[in-house]
Amino acid sequence: MSKPVITRFAPSPTGYLHIGGARTALFNWLYAKHCGGKMLLRIEDTDRERSTEAATAAILDGLTWLGLDWDGEAISQFERAPRHREVAEELVANGKAYYCYASPEELEEMREKARAEGRPPRYDGRWRDRDPSEAPAGVKPVIRIKAPRDGETVVHDAVQGDVRFPNKDLDDFIILRSDGTPTYMHAVVVDDHDMGVTHIIRGDDHLTNAARQTIIYNAMGWDVPQMSHIPLIHGADGAKLSKRHGALGVDAYRAMGYLPAALRNYLVRLGWSHGDDEIMSTEQMIEWFDVKDINKGAARFDFQKLEAINGLYMRSSDDQALFDALVAVLPEIEGGKELAEALDDKGRAQLLLAMPGLKERAKTLVELADGAKFIFASRPLALDEKAASLLNDEGRAVLKPVYPVLEAVGEWTAESLDAAIRAHAEAEGLKLGKIAQPLRAALTGRATSPGVFDVLVVLGREESLARIGDQIG
């Protein structure tokens, strides 16, 4: 019987959960779910100077917001240092690693010699077969792996295929420093083995690491997990992703008003596809996702595509769910606090009532919040430039006879209001737009908004008439 699939996401808590890390987590999560397995979370916090609790919290928050749940408790790599030392000593005892007493001066000499000969700097193995009795007094050694010197190390990769590394290029790298702390290369292997990880899915910038880690697995006689090194994300211009392209933290995307489901949908398509399917549910992603379908080429990050997908998700969202998502993000978006303060019981009811019209015009929750501002605007309304031009003398003259028409409407519904204004337009020989445009400007202070009859209903009879009255004098 085959082992259950166990993947892992292993971020370093030296900053936020960036978008590349979020995609790596998503791929690990989807593959584990697809196979009925588990995704574990390991915090690689061995860099004590740069690792912070705040960054760890931001990573956990980012994963939770994205809906990527992990199995069991998050594991701290730093806390496992005694186990890393134990395995390093075991490798020495088994003749697979050795103590190296080379001084910093000797190592610099090796580097200088390599440079002079046009070779990449490599440790020359001088303590590989020396008797430990020759060790200089008072020098704390490092532990180096006895890497094979001939042949090649092959990384069997589900995405990249077989990748071959000549062993002469890999040298006897350090697995335990002289102060007893493990190197990243060693700690990762020990942790992945002890956690039972069967599949490693990570960025292809780790491909060279995979060769060195394979050497440690082989030295311990452990099974090497199935590797999948996924291509990095580039900007739309093909250059390496930077902050100007969108290499931001997941928290920034939340504050920009993206929905987690939409961001998941966008990220899964960065380097993986299922035919021509663009929009897919989480259930479909889980059913369809397989590492063998990941592309080798770098994916390109495209904000416009993300916005378009987010807009689709917003328009298909339940009004109450979208309302809840908006309220949750208000403290984080520009101008959101003022909107949040306006949401008393009446304000909440009005915003929910306006949601069908608002979501049709917004691609993000930030745009949705901006579109809702007219509901809570103070009288007399400040008019934007286009609204002011619509409410010139001609616009006000068109609007003046509309006031008594609206005042006379019995049932204040979109249907009744529509019928009354259309009848008035016909009687005056005007096109509906000729009335709707200055009416919208008077009601919202803007030239664009949800449908004008929906706006009248959301504002209510009293507020609507008062706003029109402000403009016609």
Swiss-Prot record:
Keywords: Aminoacyl-tRNA synthetase, ATP-binding, Cytoplasm, Ligase, Nucleotide-binding, Protein biosynthesis. One of its GO terms (cellular component) is cytosol. A motif ('KMSKS' region) lies at residues 240-244. One of its GO terms (biological process) is glutamyl-tRNA aminoacylation. ATP binds at K243. It is found in: Cytoplasm. Its EC number is 6.1.1.17. Its main location: cytoplasm. Catalyzes the attachment of glutamate to tRNA(Glu) in a two-step reaction: glutamate is first activated by ATP to form Glu-AMP and then transferred to the acceptor end of tRNA(Glu). This is Glutamate--tRNA ligase 2.
